[in-house]
């Protein structure tokens, strides 16, 4: 890799750390190509990415912004998982790590400054995704309106039933 390619990789990593809500750091030692491909396809379904990175390039891209604790994440054979939704990548990687002992969770970076340990990444994976939170929020917003509409329609329905009862009584 020549100097221009390294600089290009550093810029790409900077944009990853800036744009991704959370970056999950893993050790992938011993994983086969088929296992990596399966993990990547699972992540791709959720609009996330799994990328093997060079530690020195990551440390230059982060430029010391996360301190020594963050630099300690990037030792050995490291791959990062990231996506537009901070929770989805953590969820998929955590689930895959349970199924495959070769993939080890090391930690993560939330935002650009907060370093997460393995337990924090597992806790992040238990949170609902952004789409699930939006769905719950919309449900909470719509519920009162639906109840109000039901309450407002109830007297009209009762009146219609009373009139129908009188009509059937008079017809009989």
From Swiss-Prot:
InterPro entries in alphabetical order: Ribosomal_uL10, Ribosomal_uL10-like_sf, Ribosomal_uL10_bac, Ribosomal_uL10_bac_type, Ribosomal_uL10_CS_bac
GO CC terms, sorted: large ribosomal subunit
Signal peptide residues on this chain, from the entry's feature table: none
GO BP terms: translation
Keyword DNA damage: no
Keyword field: Ribonucleoprotein, Ribosomal protein, RNA-binding, rRNA-binding
GO molecular function: large ribosomal subunit rRNA binding; structural constituent of ribosome
A family per Pfam: Ribosomal_L10
Keyword Glycoprotein on entry: no
Domain of life from the UniProt record: Bacteria
Subunit relationships: Part of the ribosomal stalk of the 50S ribosomal subunit. The N-terminus interacts with L11 and the large rRNA to form the base of the stalk. The C-terminus forms an elongated spine to which L12 dimers bind in a sequential fashion forming a multimeric L10(L12)X complex.
Classification via PANTHER family: 39S RIBOSOMAL PROTEIN L10, MITOCHONDRIAL (PTHR11560)
Recorded family membership: Belongs to the universal ribosomal protein uL10 family.
Function (record text): Forms part of the ribosomal stalk, playing a central role in the interaction of the ribosome with GTP-bound translation factors.
Protein name: Large ribosomal subunit protein uL10
Lineage: Bacteria, Pseudomonadati, Pseudomonadota, Alphaproteobacteria, Caulobacterales
């Amino acid at each position: 890799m020549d100097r221009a390619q390294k600089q290009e990789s550093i810029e790409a990593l900077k944009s990853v750390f800036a744009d991704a809500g959370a970056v999950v750091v893993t050790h992938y030692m011993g994983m086969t190509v088929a296992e990596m491909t399966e993990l990547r396809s699972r992540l791709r379904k959720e609009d996330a990415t799994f990328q093997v990175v060079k530690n020195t390039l990551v440390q230059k891209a982060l430029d010391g912004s996360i301190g020594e604790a963050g630099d300690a994440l990037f030792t050995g054979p490291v791959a990062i998982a990231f996506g537009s939704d901070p929770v989805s990548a953590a969820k998929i990687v955590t689930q895959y790590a349970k199924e495959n002992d070769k993939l080890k969770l090391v930690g993560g970076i939330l935002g650009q400054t907060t370093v997460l340990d393995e337990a924090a990444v597992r806790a992040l994976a238990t949170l609902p995704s952004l789409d699930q939170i939006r769905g719950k929020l919309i449900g909470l917003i719509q519920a009162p309106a639906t109840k109000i509409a039901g309450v407002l329609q109830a007297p009209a329905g009762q009146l219609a039933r009373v009139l129908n009862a009188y009509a059937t009584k008079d017809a009989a």
